[in-house]
């Protein structure tokens, strides 16, 4: 009984071993199939120049190695169906049953020793018979298993071969499609498979192959190629090209998709329309600019041009303080300002002169104009300068009045006086007007009394005579008045001298070519000037 149990246990062990072997064989076949598919896909990727994990050198050697490895891996799969043969084979399969039989005989002898009554039941023949049956049963089961496994393996091999052929056909179609696409031939999309990768569809890259042999770390599909120097230089050239080109819109749209390009063009048109409307708002109906600082702008500045450097100046032109001073424009502006200031001073100075008493101021202005037309420099110099000191410095002598004389000629003197008047225009304006109004009545009577016997030989202007002040040219009374008489028409009536004599005296005692108004107080010069 123990021998039968041992033989059954041996048969069960053989069956378990067969099952394990079959499971291992199937697992190996599955692994081999997967490995072969991966290797085939890797080969295709290498042919197209997209394989990242493949080594960069010796690709022909690698192909041979892959073929050898695939053959080596196929070897176990071809032998694997015969793995269950040794237990059931007649040639080399006798040793396990014999060993099992010997083990069974040993166990039977031990059982004899334990139970001598069972010895005649177990005999050599019986043991051999069971051993023979043990040999026969594994042989039959092994034959069936081998036939089934062989059939399955053949089916698997056939399917794998068909799959590989299909994959090769699909990859060939994809490669042909990509090749035609590069050459410009349009064909329908190729058949897709589970290993299809859109990054592989540009075919092999000879340049990337060469760069990879040079140990380049960048992939051939990257922007600019494997050479990083070309990437950097390409960026610089692209920027310079965008600056130098007619517009950057064409360059920008090259890297856009169709949808992005359409959106960008629509946005660009809207912005251009808004800009044109804004420019129209800044123009008058006649086409001129509404603002003065826009007069120098041209239509070319508002188009997409290669010179963005000038944009900040026009952008900040709206602010007056940031406007760059241009010499011609700035000079014209100053001349206009001077003209306006002089005309304003003329209007202010002419207000008190409209009355009867202060005829001297208007007379001086008239004489300034007449002398200027006659080109005589002598009477011009003292008339605007000498009365300037009179409102504030009453006791000053006539020779001291022209002491600060201008060294340059008349034109420069006029400019200097104009500048001083602009600087100190409204300092003494109110004071002088008040003094003029207060002393109007005091001046009228003495002026008429003293001017009748006095002589005005040549320096008296015709305008004074036209106003009705009589002058006798035969009676010169200038010498006794020069040292002691006050120089101002605003002095008290007792020591007052007429304006005509005072001007005459100033003309005679002052140098004709010198004309110093710079030393005068700045606020005293304005009422007597015509410029």
From Swiss-Prot:
Residues 386-395 have a biased composition (Low complexity). Residues 149-185 form a coiled coil. Residues 59-72, 148-185, 194-217, 227-241, 258-279, 289-302, 311-320, 361-372 have a biased composition (Basic and acidic residues). GO terms for cellular component: exon-exon junction complex. Residues 396-406 have a biased composition (Pro residues). The modification Omega-N-methylarginine is found at residues 107, 121, 128, 130. The modification Phosphoserine is found at residues 80, 111, 137, 202, 248, 255, 376, 386, 390, 521. The modification Asymmetric dimethylarginine is found at residues 131, 133, 135. It comes from the Eukaryota. The keyword Cell inner membrane does not apply. Residues 411-446 have a biased composition (Acidic residues). Probable component of the exon junction complex (EJC); the association is RNA-dependent. Probable component of the exon junction complex (EJC), a multiprotein complex that associates immediately upstream of the exon-exon junction on mRNAs and serves as a positional landmark for the intron exon structure of genes and directs post-transcriptional processes in the cytoplasm such as mRNA export, nonsense-mediated mRNA decay (NMD) or translation. This is Coiled-coil domain-containing protein 9. It comes from Homo sapiens. The gene is CCDC9.
